[in-house]
Amino acid sequence: MQVIKEELKPFINSKPKNRELPLESVKIHDNFLTDQYVKHLQSIFFNQSFPWCYSPFVGYNFQDTKISKEERDNHLYLIHKIYDNLRPIEDSFQTFDQFLPILEALEVRSLVRIRALLYVNQTVLIKHETHQDAPYPIKAALLYLNDSNGYTGFEDGTKVDSVCNRLALFDGSIPHHSTTCTDAKERLVININCF
């Protein structure tokens, strides 16, 4: 799948090695994109007019869990679906195009979804519900677009800190969780699931 035009290739600093599932551990790639491309993506997602949707829960719907109402009220985030259900989301065609260089660098054969996730500072670091991106092996890529003290945690104790321009690759069927942050206004993560 050759989708990157020659003028777009300079946006990727380091290309992960193609790996077949299952990924046995989390692989970290720092400085994945060029600084120029990171700033470009930040200008899209941190723009005041960028449309975000409110989600009252992170991970799973809390109706089936034993989390208290107080905890439920703090487990929220903003989401923007870019690609889902085998197609770009209608109002996100231009946003989707911005990810073509990333998808080629990840050697995506079949894209499942791309979502932008915005976790708002709530003055305390909140660990969200552990979840799976899918109940079957699937490649998961998390691209962190700002620095914060938030992180992605895994059941084995592995923590991936939110460092701007860091890419974390793992099997999305491995249980993991997100957090809020306390040292920045927000925590911005791009979540890509693919084969």
Residue ranges and their predicted role:
Residues E104-T123:
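A short glycine-rich, His/Asp/Glu-containing loop-to-beta-strand
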Residues L125-E129, Y136, Y144-V163:
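A short beta-strand-loop-beta hairpin characteristic of the jelly-roll/cupin
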Residues A141-L143, A184-F195:
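A short hydrophobic beta-strand segment most commonly corresponding to one strand
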Residues V160-H176:
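Conserved metal-binding segment of the jelly-roll/cupin
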Residues Q2-R109:
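Non-heme Fe(II)/2-oxoglutarate
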